[in-house]
């Protein structure tokens, strides 16, 4: 699994970097399977992955935010977000990724996950019960220090006012616009928590956004719960959405819940 996920990420990065200067990444081609517009850069990245799956006859179904579910009559599914942080990419903000995960039916049974920062090439990877790495070096979450806390939070048109309450609970707060990489920063011990509370269900997190990074977080010692404090599990279904709190140290919950 490791080798094929790394190959996919490398091919996506090559394809994304080969787009000509001045190429309109924001061009909306059609409505994706998840109900959001598919931009040119999303399509280029997705096509590279789908081509690899078909050429190598990989033993996976595919779930992607652009094309939806491709039933190849396999027991496992490759869950992909070809470009997570599309708007960052389109606007020239250097913080976006490709997210790749392999599992059977839901977040709970994801076996392997890879998130690559397509700007820097930094690659986060995890396999179930084998730990998490950044560029092949082990990573782990950090102990919570309320006097040095940094929280990540979703802020935008559909965010709940509760997100602003959450942001004030940390010494610093940031909103970076790429869920998979933000979750990985938490796994790496750079921040203490990551929070999303959307007022509109359809704008909450999708499983394709976080299938890989949730495994990376858990293997680094962190956890993710829904806003009722239940361990988050999401089916491999583009229609299912959720809000969440992710954290590196259980002590965070004493401050924010």
Report each predicted region and the residues it spans.
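An extended, acidic
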Residues: 12, 129, 141-257
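Residue-level signal for inorganic ion chemistry
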Residues: 42, 53, 86, 117, ...
């Amino acid at each position: 699994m490791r080798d094929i996920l790394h190959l996919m990420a490398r091919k996506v990065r090559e394809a994304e970097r080969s787009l000509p200067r001045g190429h309109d990444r924001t061009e909306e081609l059609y409505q994706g399977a998840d109900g959001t517009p598919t931009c040119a850069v999303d399509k280029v990245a997705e096509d590279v992955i789908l081509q690899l799956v078909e050429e190598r006859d990989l033993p996976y179904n595919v779930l992607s935010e652009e094309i939806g579910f491709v039933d190849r009559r396999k027991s496992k599914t490759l869950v992909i977000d070809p470009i997570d942080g599309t708007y960052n990419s389109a606007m020239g903000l250097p913080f976006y990724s490709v997210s790749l995960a392999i599992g059977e039916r839901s977040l709970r049974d994801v076996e392997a996950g890879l998130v690559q920062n397509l700007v820097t090439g930094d690659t986060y990877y995890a396999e179930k019960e084998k730990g998490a790495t950044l560029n092949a070096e082990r990573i782990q979450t950090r102990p919570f220090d309320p006097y040095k806390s940094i929280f990540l939070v979703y802020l935008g048109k559909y965010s709940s006012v509760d997100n602003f309450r959450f942001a004030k609970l940390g010494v610093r707060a940031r909103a970076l616009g790429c869920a998979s990489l933000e979750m990985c920063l938490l796994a790496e011990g750079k921040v203490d928590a990551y929070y999303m509370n959307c007022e509109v269900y359809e704008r909450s997190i999708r499983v394709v956004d976080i299938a890989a990074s949730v495994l990376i977080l858990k293997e680094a010692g962190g956890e993710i719960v829904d806003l009722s404090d239940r361990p988050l599990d999401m089916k491999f279904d583009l229609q299912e959405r959720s809000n969440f709190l992710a954290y590196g140290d259980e002590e965070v919950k004493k401050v924010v819940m």
